Design a protein with these regions (language model features):
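Cleavable N-terminal export/targeting peptides
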Residues: 1-27
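Transmembrane beta-barrel domains of Gram-negative outer membranes and organellar outer membranes
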Residues: 19-173, 178-184, 188-269
Length: 269
């Protein structure tokens, strides 16, 4: 349930500029910011796979998560993101499309980005959601998220890039307030000026009353990206390799599904 919060903010993160997004990852944002007066429009689609469990805890619901994002450069080291999330759900109780909610995020570099060294950025976001993506039911949920981005390019003679993100947040709904934590990592190799290949890992957890672990999971999978001057596309596929608790009457407890494919398309202007 709470995992949707972090996916909302990580679905389309990257560098926004007159050129296309050069972040080779679909789940991890890089330590870059849009330049003043420049924009980027991004559309992400996450296709979920899993068992249709019907009523009850529907952790294996199937469908699509969509996020439309506009990045607006405010200065040389900061930008703001406007995000609209929607979805398509196929379950025993709900079949159809819906507008889930929106989010506003501010991102700022820590220092000046430079090659051959660690680069960092931070972001703060507010989100509002009116539909539960796991069930299609209407409800009101507000969220507050903080994110830290670290990026390392391994020199001008190396084509490797490493990114890690740490996200923490609070989610409040009719059931109360819970804490969420997500840690993502990505390692990619830039084969040429257009193609990149890599692997990503996403670990996440949700705590009720800030002290009781409700669920956690670890997902790993490959990613591939293609970039042109003003266009880029990234595809990532994740499999759940572990989770806690692992079963509930034989059912998987990951909030979305045991397998998902995420596609991110970006245009710079």
């Amino acid at each position: 349930m709470k995992r949707r919060l972090l996916l909302l903010f990580s679905a389309a993160l990257g560098v926004a500029s007159a050129e296309a997004n050069d972040n080779p990852f679909g789940c991890s944002g890089d330590a870059c910011a849009a330049k003043h007066g420049e924009f980027e429009l991004q559309q992400s689609v996450a296709m979920r796979r899993g068992l249709d469990l019907g009523t009850g805890f529907d952790a294996g619901y199937r469908g699509y998560d969509l996020a439309t994002q506009l990045e607006i450069g405010l200065s040389e080291i900061s930008h703001v993101d406007l995000i609209l999330s929607s979805g398509v759900l196929r379950s025993a109780d709900f079949r159809g499309s819906f507008i889930e909610g929106f989010a506003v995020e501010y991102k700022r570099l820590i220092g000046v980005a430079a090659p051959d060294q660690w680069n960092a950025a931070w972001a703060g976001a507010f989100g509002y959601s009116r539909v539960d993506a796991a069930s299609g039911e209407e409800r009101t949920e507000t969220s507050y998220v903080g994110r830290l981005f670290l990026q390392r390019d391994f020199g001008t003679r190396s084509q490797w890039v490493y990114v890690t993100n740490l996200s923490t947040g609070l989610v409040h709904d009719a059931e109360g307030t819970c804490g969420v934590l997500e840690w993502s990592q990505g390692l990619a190799y830039r084969a040429d000026d257009h193609w990149s290949f890599g692997v990503e890992a996403v670990a996440e957890g949700c705590w009720t009353r800030f002290c009781t672990l409700a669920n956690s999971s670890l997902c790993v999978g490959p990613c591939v990206s293609y970039r042109m001057t003003d266009f880029s596309i990234v595809c990532t596929h994740l499999w759940q390799v572990s989770g806690s608790p692992s079963t509930d009457d034989g059912r998987n407890l990951r909030d979305t599904s045991r397998s998902e494919t995420r596609l991110l398309v970006a245009w710079g202007f």
